[in-house]
């Protein structure tokens, strides 16, 4: 279509978009302090109402809601995708003195199988037990060590790519 130098507006019918399949891979619940307020059952009900076949849970730095999320998804016929939005220390998870590593960069980590889930649990445990400095943090060494079965994605404006 030639607009001859004018601003053109294209209108699409939403009915054709309604048949598209969509899954949220970056979702926060009430367990993401200061960033999520939705209850896990509420998130799953909304996904079901929207016709989504799957849904991820990626709370900030923790997996506190994973059991409820998994069980409720299974009851409602939604495929649960287990994950976490991790904080990655720029230098080392053991660095607890420099402000550069105070909060870490955000990274979405999703488990694609049982091995991935076990590695995700290991990463979250390490973040709390060894890497906690203002927030639970991991580092790239830990990611390299426990990467099997995981899908890694940039997160948000707090991620390494956006920084």
Question: Which stretches of residues belong to each language-model region?
Answer:
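Phosphodiester-processing cores and adjacent nucleic acid-binding clamps
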Residues: 4, 9-163
């Amino acid at each position: 279509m030639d607009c001859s130098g004018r601003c053109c507006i294209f209108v699409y019918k939403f009915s054709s978009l309604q048949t598209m399949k969509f899954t949220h891979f970056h979702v926060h619940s009430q367990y993401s302090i200061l960033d999520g307020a939705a209850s896990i059952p509420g998130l799953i009900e909304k996904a079901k109402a929207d016709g989504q076949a799957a849904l991820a849970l990626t709370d900030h730095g923790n997996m506190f809601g994973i059991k409820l999320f998994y069980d409720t998804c299974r009851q409602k016929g939604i495929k649960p995708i287990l994950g976490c939005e991790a904080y990655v220390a720029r230098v080392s998870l053991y660095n607890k003195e420099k402000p550069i590593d105070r909060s870490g960069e955000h990274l979405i980590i999703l488990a694609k199988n049982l091995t991935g889930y076990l590695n995700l649990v290991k990463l979250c445990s390490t973040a709390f037990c060894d890497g906690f400095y203002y927030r639970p943090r991991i580092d790239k060494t830990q990611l390299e060590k426990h990467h099997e079965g995981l899908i890694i994605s940039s997160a948000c404006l707090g991620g390494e790519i956006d920084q």
